[in-house]
A protein has these predicted regions:
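Histidine-centered divalent metal-coordination motifs
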Residues: 46, 131, 170, 208-210
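N-terminal hydrophobic targeting/anchoring segments and the immediately downstream early-domain regions
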Residues: 192-220
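Catalytic nucleophile loop
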Residues: 33-61
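Amide-donor transfer/coupling interface in amidating biosynthetic enzymes
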Residues: 20-40, 65, 69-192
């Protein structure tokens, strides 16, 4: 899809910015916020993962081949001992492949405490790649759960245990392996449906409700 307009983030456009689509940006960002507030399960793919971050307080990198990936190096000879110098570097892998969409072209490493790891039971996945932008800062509502070997954020998940996930690759082209993510989404959607049916019949009074939603009785 088109790049997300950096003006949504209070940034001026980089010379490397591609086409933008204002008619798409606004409804997507609004829908994400509405779905988030209603606890709806969400799976963001590629631009969708970036839109999740932007809509909920995170940031994206306009072009991953500019220096933005943070590194910390301890320099003992040039500086006083244990003083830390923060440096930044650019992505080094090819993230916009020329290979067919069904071909995996680089790996990602999964956080072992993530939903992704629970689904795949592997610490390393091979994925396809079609992007020049990526999540830069996941924000307070998400945590980073997958990285490429060069440090680009490849997946984010809710830090609040909501059924929300974003992946930078395109699982819809990855056959059976990609299908696991859609099975997860269907399963979470079914759980939401069952919870909603329950709350239509039973009014739950709880100071910590895991499935807050809009009730037909008029209770929000």
């Amino acid at each position: 899809g088109a790049d997300i307009n950096p003006l949504w983030l209070g940034e001026e456009p980089s010379p490397k910015l591609h086409n933008i689509n204002a008619e798409r940006d606004l409804p997507e960002l609004m829908l994400i916020r509405l779905a988030f507030n209603r606890q709806l399960p969400i799976l963001g793919i590629c631009r969708g993962a970036q839109a999740l971050a932007v809509a909920l307080g995170g940031k994206i990198q306009q072009d991953i081949y500019d220096e933005y990936i943070r590194e910390e190096e301890t320099v003992e000879k040039k500086l006083s001992k244990d003083k830390t110098v923060i440096t930044y570097r650019a992505a080094t892998l090819k993230h916009s492949q020329d290979a067919e969409r069904c071909e995996a072209t680089h790996s990602v490493t999964l956080n072992k405490s993530s939903v992704l790891y629970a689904l795949y039971k592997e610490e390393r996945l091979m994925v396809n790649s079609f992007h020049h932008q990526a999540v830069k800062d996941a924000g307070k509502h998400f945590r980073v759960t997958a990285l490429s070997p060069d440090g680009v954020i490849e997946a984010i998940e809710s830090s609040e245990f909501k059924p929300i996930m974003g992946v930078q690759w395109h699982p819809e082209w990855m056959g059976e392996e990609g299908g696991k993510l859609f099975q997860w989404l269907v399963g979470q959607s079914n759980n939401f449906y069952l919870a909603k049916q329950l709350h239509q019949r039973i009014l739950t009074l709880d100071t910590h409700c895991d499935t807050p939603m809009f009730f037909p009785q008029g209770v929000n």
